[in-house]
Structure formats: structure tokens, C-alpha cells
Amino acid sequence: MGLLYEWNSDQKSKSINKHFDSINSLSIESNEDFVILENDELTLVVSISSGSIVESRLKKYPVENVDGSMGFRVFGFSDATSFKYYFKSGFTGISPSFIVKEADSNYVLLEDPTLGVSKKISFSSNPYEVAVYDSSLRGVEGKSYAGLYRSQGRSLDLKRGALEGGMMNNSSYEGVAISSELDPYTTSRLASIDEPLEVLSRSGWVAFVQKYFFAAIIGSDDYIYNYYALPKESGFYRMGYTVEGLSLNNFTYGHEHRLFIGPKIRKDLIERAQNLELAIDMGWFWFLA
């Protein structure tokens, strides 16, 4: 029994050391390439040039139960496995290169003066939600879109060791989920997407379902969306939507996207969006509430 305790303690120490090593190697600071936004629940890293949210951490859920541990990541990357997962939005048909126009700890306003488009990323009044507003002064011929871009691989920061809950983590379901007027909950593993999946719907949502925490792009009752999940291209699976019927005289001027990045708490998900609680119905459960 003593040997088992000693071995468990050694494994725990290794896990903690590995976490702090990863913090040091993957640490991103605000500079000419990135802006960091922060509130009580989330820390976000935004790529200035693309406007993508390239990392998110849940501050109230540390990876290790020790002082100095950082929160679990939903979006992020791993140099060891080349894994990447990020959020991107904008207008189809154009590829802006942004600069910072305004920034504070809880929002950033980016603009591309040449194309006349801007993007504001800010925290919503709803916990664990981010508002992303894309706009164009002159109008854009493309559609508004928002998407999750994910390479193949297991979710970041989950324990994999057998004595750390790794058996449940490794067997938990991971895949794209879409909720629409046609079907409240359809899912597909990424590797099984060999042709585009599309559905038109008012409101609804699209998400990548994973254990404990996940990201979802939530639609509005005021718009019709073409939800999609696409086969792997250039190393990434893409899941998201385009906003349909939004153009005025064939031009689109703006849209605000609603992005949830948070824990799987059933009561919260029920109140947040219709059918969003179904994202916790697959695999093993770990109740946070």
C-alpha cells in the first residue's frame, strides 16, 4: 500500500511539473501579434492579424489543484502533437489583415483600413460568453460566418493516466454536434466526416463536444443559418455557420456572433440555449454542479 501511495505521489508530481513546463513553453503575452482579454471566468488570446481566438482558459477550473496552475484550455495548441483548435469569424470571400484600433482588458477592436472591415471581440454579460461583431462600412459581397477550426487529436489538458481518471477521459465522446429546427441534436465524429454536412435553421447552435468543457456558436431566433461540418482540409476540420438572407442589395454590413466557452453544467446549458444541455448526454458524466 505504501509503495502504491508513493508511486501515485510521484505520478502527481510529474503531472504538476509537466503542466508548469507547458505554461513556460506555451506562454503568450500581449505584443504586436496577440492581445489578451480577461474577465472573472475566461482568459482569451486573440491573434491580431487574423482576429482569431487562438487560446481560451477557464480560470475557475485549474488544470492542477495547486497554486499557480492555469485554467483548462478549450481553444489552444500543442507543439508536442501539432494540435490546434481556434475560433474564427468574418465575411466569406475576403481575408483581412487586422491592426489594433482600440484595446482594453475586456475587449479589442480590430480593423483593416484597406478592406474597410472591423471586428470587436468582447465579453458578454452572460458568464462564459463572448460577443464577436464583424462589420463593414462599405458592405461586403460575401456572407457573415463563424467557425470552429480543429485539427485531429484529443482535447487539451485532460488527464490521460489510468489513476487520474484517464480511462473515462480517453473513452469520452468527442465530435461535432449541430442543433437545428430539423433535429435537436445530431453528432458525428470528425474522422467520419467524408462529405459536407449542412442544415438550414433559424436559431440553433453548432459545437465541438468534448469532456468537461466545450465551445459552441449559438444562433439567434432573428436569423437563418446554414450550419455545416466539413471534411478535413489543410489539416483542419471546420464546423460553423454562414448567416443566410442577411445581405442588403447583395451586400452584407455586419453580424454579431455569440460564442460560448464553458463547463458542462446542465442547469446552465438549459437556460443558455434550447437543446444545449444535450451536449452532455454522451459518454461518461462528470457533474461540475
Feature annotation, model-predicted:
Residues 14-35:
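Short extracytoplasmic/periplasmic juxtamembrane "stem" segments immediately C-terminal to an N-terminal membrane anchor
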Residues 277-289:
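Short, membrane-interfacial amphipathic segments enriched in basic
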Residues 1-18:
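Subset of Sec-pathway N-terminal targeting signals
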Residues 38-279:
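Soluble non-transmembrane domains of integral membrane proteins
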Residues 4, 202, 281-283:
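Intrinsically disordered regions, especially transient/low-confidence alpha-helical propensity segments
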